[in-house]
Regions:
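Extended, folded cores of ATP/NTP-driven motor/assembly subunits in large transport
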Residues: 2-438
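P-loop NTPase motor domains
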Residues: 83, 90-109, 120, 287, ...
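The conserved Walker
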Residues: 467, 479
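Hydrophobic anchor at the beta1->P-loop junction of P-loop NTPases
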Residues: 475
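Conserved lysine of the Walker
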Residues: 483
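Hydrophobic positions on the alpha1 helix immediately C-terminal to the Walker A/P-loop
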Residues: 486
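Post-Walker A helix-loop "phosphate-sensing" segment adjacent to the P-loop in P-loop NTPases
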Residues: 493-504
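A short helix-turn-beta junction within AAA+ P-loop NTPase domains corresponding to the substrate/partner-engaging
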Residues: 521-524, 733-746
Length: 825
């Protein structure tokens, strides 16, 4: 066995000790030697069986997912999710290593553990025919069809035609299934709690799910058609009848290194050797191959007392070897202190291993590593085997075919918790835990929108923000980074994926009008001379709320408006001004209620002028231009409603100071719309471009943060869009909003913004590189709760590209072509 070590100081450095000193696993003395011998006998009988049902490696499968592997042995399978490991910070990776170490150390010596990562291909008849977005309304049917075509084409570029799953199967001894249930339940609970420490969700598979997984390994490519209703005392059918192949040939065309199952060819390879360093990425390198794969690690814990005795025996043996070498040297006249380097090195390793077992919470395991792949032809199988072995060799892992042992190997790869292959070695806890099952993280949520392709694997990145506990989020990037393209794409995603929801856009630059028009939405322009009127004191949509609640909300809104009007607003409103404003808001509502109407800014302005304090006159003077003259479109009863499913509020005609005033007024309209009792069944998606402008005034920030915090409870999903975030993140309220959000789409950042995001989101050096100055437009980092995926995007030109594109040269060229076509007509 080659010398191998892990690259962490607190981990065993040279697992080669195990190979050099311990050799194979035949010397192990088990306390339950009789039981193990009986299990080995049954395994041999199963492997030799010529009857298919007797060959398949379990006796019974129960509805709850517990399998009787053989008499006295029962197993259960837990599926667990991926985590951002490969690009995570050093501290996060070390935490994951510690958790995986504690997970393996948890299992007792009488159990068996099987860790698997499976790349399962989607059915062939679904490739290229997947429906990502339903046609929906007539206005969007053509866009949905085009979108589906493009995404189906892109599926073939990565491994999106494969579905990756991770499983942990554990087997225990028990007299019968009733005795096994509490044992397995306790293990399941402890496993789920342990994995949760690294934000890894897990769940136990039920019987039907385990059978489907078994069939996928025994009969690759076949469709699962099992139902418990098909089993009955009269039918005589067994669960095995639905998962086992009709034919198995372990010498296809005279070969001994593969097999044929129902017309498909498969091969199982074994891990024979490790390099001088066990790389934590070696499993990920194999798993990320765009191939159907099953990577299986069988781990059999050894009792600590037995492991210590085993190592001590090997040390005693080496001491004897050293004495023999020294005596021989004396007889031949050599220096007896000069020992063969290999023997001296082995003795040092053995003593180091003994120290790890005694003092550093390490245990010893019998380890078997298997890699299983399959194909429709022998030629394709050979190519896939060559790919796997080449990648493994690049990671200094020796994979070899199991000649004449494919029969045993095929029974060892299904998730049953039973190993029929005798190619094994001893590894310690650290060496097993280093073999991380986490590859390039994928995000493929059914019903989600498209955000690009994984930069690591080429997979489609599909995210459904409605699944998040806090779906609020931010899309940020420098000008030219692809930020606007991403936002327009997400708006299209939302419209197509969630036809029952509403979309509202705050458009300070006037760039979303074409998209909204194409999606069948309404554009509302707020500017001098336009017909649209927004009343910030409107309460029409919250008429059923108590008067005190309505007044409190409107007071907050007017305080925010007043703060935005103040030149010294960055310091906030003085308490005296706050009291005057609150008093006048109440008086405006009371006076107008007598006439049975809602107050306007003019009524509020009149109430200010009637106050005795000189500060009231100053506040009234600030509002005067919004009550009289060209900017008076905020003084009147609202004639703008969110009746259309998609509404774009175009504010590019407003000046910078007035734009914040307009945003707050529009926010009030949205808040009136969503904060109703009981909450509306559908969601409202709010996209706020140039959101950083709302963080210049403390009172405005307080108002916006409250809406951000409370709106989620009423089905409001906010997205802040910004090209300059370092100033925004310097605000304490803004930081709280970021910390309470779970969705971030970050493109290329300036140095200051990059540092701010890295601190807020605890980005690793690798993750910083995904949004650094060297990335191309469209590239970035998508964060959805605990999932972090680097993205890239090369979206083909066409109708959708034209709707989303904001590159000035391409937009100008497109407009010239359109004008030329119109001139010809």
């Amino acid at each position: 066995m080659s010398r191998a070590r892990t690259n962490k100081e607190n981990r065993p450095k040279r697992p080669s000790t195990l190979g050099l000193l311990l050799g194979g696993t035949g010397g192990r003395k088990d306390a339950s030697k009789g039981a193990e011998a009986e299990r080995q006998r049954r395994r041999r009988e199963r492997d030799r069986s010529r009857e298919m049902a007797a060959y398949v490696g379990y006796d019974a499968m129960y509805r709850d997912g517990i399998a009787q592997v053989m008499p006295g042995m029962f197993s259960q399978t837990v599926e667990f999710s991926d985590i951002s490991y490969q690009s995570a910070r050093k501290e996060a990776r070390e935490t994951a290593f510690t958790v995986m170490s504690s997970l393996f150390n948890y299992f007792p010596a009488d159990s068996h553990v099987q860790l698997q990562v499976v790349n399962a291909p989607i059915p062939a008849d679904e490739v290229g025919r997947k429906v990502f977005f339903e046609p929906g309304e007539r206005a969007t049917a053509g866009l949905a069809a085009e979108y589906n075509r493009i995404l189906n084409d892109k599926m073939r570029e990565g491994v999106s035609n494969l579905v990756r799953h991770r499983y942990l199967t554990y087997a225990v001894g028990a007299d019968d299934v009733d005795a096994a249930v509490p044992k397995l339940a306790r293990i399941r609970g402890d496993v789920e709690q342990t994995l949760a420490r690294i934000r890894c969700s897990s769940r136990a598979l039920d019987g039907a799910e385990r059978l489907e997984l078994l069939q996928g390994q025994l009969r690759p490519g076949s469709r699962f058609e099992f139902s418990w209703d098909k089993l009955s005392p009269t039918s005589g059918a067994r669960t095995k009848d639905f998962v086992m192949p009709s034919t198995l040939d372990f010498k296809p065309e005279g070969r001994s290194d593969c097999f044929r199952s129902d017309g498909r060819y498969g091969a199982v390879l074994a891990v024979r050797s490790f390099g001088s360093v066990i790389e934590e990425t070696y499993l990920a390198s194999i798993i990320d191959l765009p191939l159907p794969l099953n990577v299986t690690l069988h781990v059999q814990p050894i009792a600590q007392s037995e492991a210590l005795a085993l190592v001590k025996r090997q040390i005693d043996w080496m001491d004897k070897e050293i004495i023999d070498e020294q005596m021989s040297a004396v007889k031949k006249g050599y220096d007896y202190q000069i020992l063969p380097p290999e023997l001296r090195f082995s003795k040092e390793e053995a003593e180091e291993l003994l120290d790890f077992l005694r003092n550093k919470s390490e245990r010893l395991f019998v380890y078997t590593g298997l890699v299983y792949t399959w194909a429709d032809s022998l030629e394709e199988l050979d190519r896939r085997v060559q790919q796997v072995t080449s990648v493994a060799q690049g990671c200094t892992i020796g994979l070899e075919p199991l000649h004449f042992r494919q029969r045993q190997a095929l029974n060892s790869v299904p998730p049953l918790g039973d190993n029929h292959v005798t190619v094994s070695r001893y590894l310690t806890t650290g060496q097993v835990a280093m073999q991380m099952p986490f590859a390039s993280q994928s995000l493929d949520e059914a019903g989600g929108g498209y955000y690009g392709q994984s930069k690591e694997s080429g997979n489609l990145v599909l995210c459904d923000r409605k699944r998040l506990a806090s779906p609020m989020g931010f899309v940020c990037g420098k000008p030219g980074s692809g930020k606007s393209f991403s936002v327009k794409r997400e708006i299209t995603n939302t419209v197509l994926a969630h036809p029952e929801d509403e979309v509202v856009i705050f458009d300070p630059a006037g760039e979303y009008g074409n998209l909204v028009g194409a999606l069948g939405g309404a554009n509302v322009e707020l500017a001098p001379g336009c017909s649209a009127v927004l009343n910030p004191l409107d309460t029409a949509d919250v008429a059923d709320r108590a008067d005190a609640a309505k007044l409190a909300y409107k007071t907050d809104a007017v305080l925010a408006l007043s703060s935005a009007l103040m030149a010294e607003g960055r310091e906030g409103l003085p308490e005296r001004d706050r009291s005057i404003i609150a008093r006048c808001v109440g008086e405006a509502y009371r006076e107008c209620a007598k006439d049975g109407r809602l107050p306007t800014l003019g009524d509020f302005h009149a109430a200010l002028l009637a106050q005795p304090e000189p500060e009231a006159a100053d506040i009234a003077l600030r509002y005067e231009r919004y009550v009289k003259g060209a900017f008076s479109f905020f003084n009147g009863q609202s004639n703008v409603a969110l009746d259309n499913r998609i509404t774009n509020i175009d504010m590019h005609g407003l000046g910078q100071n007035m734009r914040v005033f307009g945003m707050i007024t529009a926010l009030e309209m949205v808040r009136n719309r969503v904060m109703v009792t009981p909450p509306r069944p559908n969601y409202t998606w709010l996209y706020i471009d140039e959101v950083q402008s709302l963080f210049a005034h403390p009172t405005v920030v307080e108002y916006f943060a409250r809406l951000w915090r409370e709106g989620r409870k009423f089905g409001l999903i906010c997205t802040g869009i910004s090209q300059n975030t370092s100033h925004m993140l310097a605000n304490a309220e803004a930081r709280d909003m970021v910390l309470n959000s779970e969705f971030f789409l970050l493109h290329k950042q300036s140095t200051a913004d990059l540092d701010a995001w890295a601190e807020m989101l605890q980005l690793s050096a690798t993750e910083r590189g995904y949004i650094g100055d060297a990335v191309k437009p469209g590239e970035g980092l998508l964060i959805s709760a605990g999932i972090r995926v680097p993205i890239t995007d090369d979206f083909p030109k066409g109708p959708l590209y034209d709707l989303w594109n904001t590159k000035p040269a391409e937009v100008a060229e497109r407009e010239m072509r359109r004008a030329a076509r119109e001139a010809e007509e």
